[in-house]
Amino acid sequence: MGSSDSSSGSAQKAARHQHEPPPPRQRGSAPELPPGFRFHPTDEELVVHYLKKKAAKVPLPVTIIAEVDLYKFDPWELPEKATFGEQEWYFFSPRDRKYPNGARPNRAATSGYWKATGTDKPILASGTGCGLVREKLGVKKALVFYRGKPPKGLKTNWIMHEYRLTDVSGSTTTSRPPPPVTGGSRAAASLRLDDWVLCRIYKKINKAAAGDQQRSTECEDSVEDAVTAYPLYATAGMAGAGAHGSNYASPSLLHHQDSHFLEGLFTADDAGLSAGATSLSHLAAAARASPAPTKQFLAPSSSTPFNWLDASPAGILPQARNFPGFNRSRNVGNMSLSSTADMAGAAGNAVNAMSAFMNPLPVQDGTYHQHHVILGAPLAPEATTGGATSGFQHPVQVSGVNWNP
């Protein structure tokens, strides 16, 4: 008997523990929400499931909205008073009158005031029936916080959405008339306008400033990338010049080093000449065999699309110039660059021959003289007629060549 009574008593105690409500949560403690859940209710959900129940003193499903008198704090102090939220915060707050017998609410805060913006937005019940009259559940008002005293306050980015009820049945949240003043004293009048309103507080992000900051960051990154890449480019260029030796012709070398000018002109990489058995001695021999003067006028021709000189007769070939130290033999690809000691005096004529080679314009008058050297061989005398360009297949123009160093 004793064992059966003890077992039945323990079972009753366990049943009572199961039906007992959980202990009340301490104020300010964070609610126990499953991972991934966010508290972002709609306007209708805020009014129906939270504000109405709070006004009717019905227990809420979860303590997620704190009770704070918003007008006793500045908006930047409210996030630490909230129970839950990262970008927006929810509060139950009372509302007082501005004047004892008036209906206007008091919007003054610690260091500023809340100013209403726009018109009140009605919150209607959701309905799907055709022609169904939707019930008005509450009113939503938007307010902006200003620092200082009205009307010269400084506008901030802090926004408040205030929700209040419109149905007076079973609720004390709606605006109620002030109690009558007795004894001629206004101090006894109550300033309470609404017991509870629900407020959502957040700070608006200035999109224009955010966009300017992003563009400024991108511009700084681009400048840093350019500054970082330029030394690498310059170092790579110098390394390339050192690897090619004197045969590597960069624009700076062509402008500042006359001794390497002709070598850079004959470099296969810069001139783009096809492989062949051309040698500098053939060019010099062709120049010595020509009775033409050093400076010649070259007339433009319509038979060739390569008009390398200006159409006016002012285009004059540069004067011959000797290049000291050009007494070396070097092979560039299949093209031989050879010179001996007796070619030192003929270097100027070789330059003139190369000038004629680089400007294959046919002669239109008998007074003009022109020599075309194609792969080391001069053209036949009949090449000075209209078909002079038939043997020239790939004229090459060297960009960036300074003929008057």
From Swiss-Prot:
SUPFAM superfamilies: NAC domain. Disruption phenotype: No visible phenotype, but higher chlorophyll content and delayed senescence. It is found in: Nucleus. Residues 137-210 bind DNA. GO terms for cellular component: nucleus. Residues 33-204 form the NAC domain. High grain protein content (GPC) is a desirable trait in breadmaking and pasta wheat varieties because of its positive effects on quality and nutritional value while Low GPC is a desirable trait for barley malt and beer production. This is NAC transcription factor NAM-A1. The gene is NAM-A1.
